[in-house]
Amino acid sequence: MNMLSSLDDSAARSRAATAAPFGAASASLAFSDVEPGEDQRWSTWPATQPSERGPQPRPEWLVTSAAAIDTELGIVKTGKEADLWLIERAVPGAPAEVPGNATLLAAKRYRGAENRLFHRSAIYTEGRGTRRSRDVRAVQRSSSYGREVARVEWAYAEFAALSRLTELGAAVPYPVQVSETEVLMEFIGDGRVAAPRLAQVRATPDGLRDLFHQIAGFMRTLAHAGLAHGDLSPYNLLVDRGRVVAIDLPQVVDVVANPNGFDLLHRDCVNVCEWFTRQRLECDAEELFAELVGDVTR
């Protein structure tokens, strides 16, 4: 069974599980009479604090009803730091075409502290606020508590970065909410098919120029705010029907406060320009870096 057919099967199970309780013939059922089915849970939105929810103004597609059910439709991507799941959040029985009744979300769930991101975390976290000494020691010892602390910290760091960049107008998925080690965000794709990464895209020369200008514009938006992605590459840039969207953002750095900030910004420039150069589009990493440094220090 391929991924798409698996997602379709999960969606069919979710519809079957919820159609009867919320159908027209069952309108008299009390809310308490309904229970989520397999691969489902009640929407976690009502349980989150205001600070754990995405910034205002919120998009009209956002589902905030306490009657909504979250259904896991399948795994989209397994990564080194986290797994990405496709979630449908919907109010069963409500017209799906009406904004606020149903939407697809990406659930990024951080796994553990044994991988690349956590091992190199000090590079990115210098200049950030301090943690409790107990937490610092636990993370350094890689105890079970320390691993959990690290997972939660990176989830909240990604949510904070997405929220900040959304407010700046940068092209990133809208952050819906964060809870423990899970970040729920806008799903970027066509239907249930995730948008391809830049590394998978083959474009015309004009198309490549447009993609580069979008990416440079994204980097410029961050630089104006004194920030850098910190790990930018063709693998964490999605191309959604011609629009570039940046993902994987827990390591966003304050270029000035972090001693490694300008080095990380330079690496971002090199990674981007190397890919475009391989596609036979002229791109000067040093020129891009100099321009962005000027934006940071302006």
What is the predicted role of each segment?
Residues 149-152, 205, 209-216, 220:
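Conserved short alpha-helix within the protein kinase catalytic core
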Residues 231, 235-237:
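Catalytic-loop signature of eukaryotic-like protein kinases
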Residues 48-194, 220, 224:
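Conserved ATP-binding subdomain of kinase catalytic cores across diverse folds
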Residues 79, 230-231:
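A short acidic Gly-Thr/Ser loop motif
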Residues 193-204:
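AlphaC helix of the protein kinase catalytic domain
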Residues 2-74:
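Juxta-kinase regulatory segment immediately upstream of eukaryotic protein kinase catalytic domains
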